[in-house]
Amino acid sequence: MASKGILKNGGKPPTAPSSAAPTVVFGRRTDSGRFISYSRDDLDSEISSVDFQDYHVHIPMTPDNQPMDPAAGDEQQYVSSSLFTGGFNSVTRAHVMEKQASSARATVSACMVQGCGSKIMRNGRGADILPCECDFKICVDCFTDAVKGGGGVCPGCKEPYKHAEWEEVVSASNHDAINRALSLPHGHGHGPKMERRLSLVKQNGGAPGEFDHNRWLFETKGTYGYGNAIWPEDDGVAGHPKELMSKPWRPLTRKLRIQAAVISPYRLLVLIRLVALGLFLMWRIKHQNEDAIWLWGMSIVCELWFALSWVLDQLPKLCPINRATDLSVLKDKFETPTPSNPTGKSDLPGIDIFVSTADPEKEPVLVTANTILSILAADYPVDKLACYVSDDGGALLTFEAMAEAASFANLWVPFCRKHEIEPRNPDSYFNLKRDPFKNKVKGDFVKDRRRVKREYDEFKVRVNGLPDAIRRRSDAYHAREEIQAMNLQREKMKAGGDEQQLEPIKIPKATWMADGTHWPGTWLQASPEHARGDHAGIIQVMLKPPSPSPSSSGGDMEKRVDLSGVDTRLPMLVYVSREKRPGYDHNKKAGAMNALVRASAIMSNGPFILNLDCDHYVYNSKAFREGMCFMMDRGGDRLCYVQFPQRFEGIDPSDRYANHNTVFFDVNMRALDGLQGPVYVGTGCLFRRIALYGFDPPRSKDHTTPWSCCLPRRRRTRSQPQPQEEEEETMALRMDMDGAMNMASFPKKFGNSSFLIDSIPVAEFQGRPLADHPSVKNGRPPGALTIPRETLDASIVAEAISVVSCWYEEKTEWGTRVGWIYGSVTEDVVTGYRMHNRGWKSVYCVTHRDAFRGTAPINLTDRLHQVLRWATGSVEIFFSRNNALFASSKMKVLQRIAYLNVGIYPFTSVFLIVYCFLPALSLFSGQFIVQTLNVTFLTYLLIITITLCLLAMLEIKWSGIALEEWWRNEQFWLIGGTSAHLAAVLQGLLKVIAGIEISFTLTSKQLGDDVDDEFAELYAVKWTSLMIPPLTIIMINLVAIAVGFSRTIYSTIPQWSKLLGGVFFSFWVLAHLYPFAKGLMGRRGRTPTIVYVWSGLVAITISLLWIAIKPPSAQANSQLGGSFSFP
């Protein structure tokens, strides 16, 4: 690994074990100072073989780090064993990793005929020869017996061989690559690079890059289902496809409407409460409290705002729905042998999974490693998965932890596949409280589990010991470097005859890797070019792309785990740390995600992207398939993303601070699913890549804009003009009338990477659903994705280095209209809003078994800071162009109201705090918000309260949440509204008015100090200024209740109605703030003294201030029977 600070001045590393050799260069400097990556042809022609020398780096053994793997090609082996670095100020370089010697040899394919086991047939290049399309492996002798004595029938699929002679089989094998190449459309021209990529681009010349449908129909030997122009006659299938004729077409998903007995009363109650609120507010405005007009005025303003807030929150809930998937149909369509896919290879599209981390101190690397292991073990075609780890901190600790995880995955992933383990996060699995042996029928499960558990414990010890190991290693190398420098200085002085005292030598304390070279990322002690905001870009392929065919190994005597018949392949795993330099805005998480989008487009180009936080792991191994059911179903090409609910572990049983947030995830999100789709919540979301690129959805001109799900829909006619602002907002990236993309403007939008631009039409085509039904208007032929992916070569990874550099996004539309959107701390909501604003739809996928699980802060202070960040992002959205008031006509009205509520809800805190002080002011003054508690007021109040309770009961009914969860949400709504939301409004206003930027720190995911208590963090009290407003409300209301009782008891004419009104109001406030007060109590002896000091000072100050403003009269003093008076 190398960076600018390591290999400048001729590419010599700063170590002295041996003479350094020049590294492999993949770019050149332009006149402007930028570095442009060489193409593959440039590498072959311009760089001599002398330049290709090795720079050795030692890394831990991984499944890919095996020496001289004969199964891998030279290019792929070179890429998987090299680490690439580069950036704005350094040439892109590849550095070959030093391999550790291993006695393990690659497994040689054996004949699959029972009782044989000989080596299978191979051609002159050493590639396997498979004479049948079913890929049944057979040796020469068995093949001869099958042809001569078996009637020419394959022993595997029982179908006749097409080639019965050995020469014909060899000839067919030599042309296998050509036949496979014809199974997908190609661009014609632009050299070898374009020949390797599927192109749907229509150039100005017409023929180059044009989609040749005739080539699909006449030059291929596959078939794409019933209805083709030509039905192949030589595939062993005669007549019509029996499977398609016997099996009716079935959808992959179903929409489950809420029962009319529940949803109809729900909508009726909403209408009743809306009318009651209107009548109540009109009555309140007409009947003023002349004795306390100021109290009446404050209350009526707050109530008007609360009514508006309730309407904005309630209207999008009118159309809730549920959805269900059918995984058996997905398997039948994409993984079952058909005439178009006779081998039954998976025809599912690829998925690129993004895992983001930034600080290994606050986000433990062991948590991230467990998340990676759960992804690698997911139940999805191995060759269709690619996992990218974004280390925005550039830490060596994260890099080495990922290498350890890749090594342990070689045992963990096959173990999960063999015994169908759930969940596939090893830490969660081994800590299950249920019986781990339930429903396990294989006799060797106990032995395998015991062995894997021992290996995992050793894995944890190694990962937990990495920080100390890196620190000790760095100290040792630094000491050696200082000694060498001092010796060199002495030699120079002796040679020159100078006997002066040695000068102190200052050498920057670097972070060293295991081979004795500098780490190109962030050092433990920051220095120029090696700090969090200043380091080179790094890409390391931890696990190379797997082979297209399943591979298995026999019993491993060393590990004593029998993996016979188990697919031992692992998905591709890539470590990425984007380049950071001073003077460039890194745009936090959104910038890191966009860097991964570009790098993954070049290296794997999965048409779908799943992003996960480092602490959210795959709890349901079939979750990827569940999401793919929606994307591949009829009409799925108009879906921009599939959002999964967030579920959390490690929450206290009472869920004191509403961390589960079930009201949002099970009520609001299900309701939005009935409109245009749920909002994007930052993790657990499966994206369509071209939607992130800023494309309009297919058939965007035929979109509808209903006012609600209950009213009839009106289709927009083509004669109606598009608004100008809508055209500017949605980017003119839509498909032309002939179905081809206009790519002339792509470099201005996506940058100057030709690799990236070439990958866009490929991702669009591969993301289409199957054209297996007449209603599928934008489908692809079945069997089009059964060919293996391209192998990685050095030029591809070098190009990936260039697109993660700090300068690449300059003068492009990344972050403004393409990818994750910049400008808000809640980039997730803004990104989802932009997609919906272009007319895309999204769906909410609630699986029977939770798809993903993560952690949430159970500490009060951490929870408040989390809510503060969310609310601040909402304020930023409200004051930006992403305000839903400026949404295009492609967004549905109720969806627009939902997004408008996202930006408005923090402002409710201003009115909420005022309203929480009103009962105290009533008790202090002896007045109430109304003149008298008459029957009309009480009737309105009763109707509003009863309808609210009934609506809550019906929401609980159709969403499936518990009553306690609903009440916890109500409590924390007031806690957050009187603390974090108010601070968010103030910070947002400061940013808009004064331009003061807002900075947030990551929420710590470390466990508490008390390791014996799972919920130790729950009781820890950490003081923050956010606690002052709710603490003040509690103390003032308690004092006001005491004052109100005293005044009423000693009054000659007690006004019990006003006292009861004020006391009831105060108890309502205090009941909502009870979890906050309980959190301040902590455990005995743990509550900070400052809490008591602030409580007393605030209560005394407010009381004295009130008395100074309105001192008691002499008559009141005489009634109280006391002669004491304030000065």
Curated annotation (Swiss-Prot):
Induction: Down-regulated by 1-N-naphthylphthalamic acid (NPA), an auxin efflux inhibitor. GO terms for biological process: cell wall organization; cellulose biosynthetic process; plant-type primary cell wall biogenesis. Residues 1-24 are annotated as: Disordered. Its EC number is 2.4.1.-. One of its GO terms (cellular component) is plasma membrane. It comes from the Eukaryota. Specifically expressed in root hair cells. GO terms for molecular function: cellulose synthase (UDP-forming) activity. It holds the Pfam family zf-RING_4. Disruption phenotype: Plants develop short elongated root hair with kinks and swellings along their length. Keywords: Cell wall biogenesis/degradation, Glycosyltransferase, Golgi apparatus, Membrane, Transferase, Transmembrane, Transmembrane helix. The chain crosses the membrane at residues 262-282, 292-312, 910-930, 936-956, 982-1002, 1025-1045, 1059-1079, 1089-1109. PANTHER family: X-BOX TRANSCRIPTION FACTOR-RELATED. Belongs to the glycosyltransferase 2 family. Plant cellulose synthase-like D subfamily. This is Cellulose synthase-like protein D1. It comes from Oryza sativa subsp. japonica. The gene is CSLD1.
